[in-house]
């Protein structure tokens, strides 16, 4: 299990990446409540967007969130399309 520092929601926020299983646990880095989007609350929005761009570089099959339904199909592709440019 790989621990990834993902500041933004909070300064000490982390995501967990189970590489062998292809699962990213994004926590509160982002949400999937009304479609894939950034977290509802960020202490630092710029840091949060940077964290999302970094997560978009990973290869995973599924992603789980602190809020909203998991994405189990094309999860990494959806992240890349949404945040690869840090947008």
Where are these regions (language model features)?
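Acidic/His-rich, metal-assisted hydrolase cores and their charged scaffolds
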Residues: 84-87
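Metallo-beta-lactamase
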Residues: 2-82
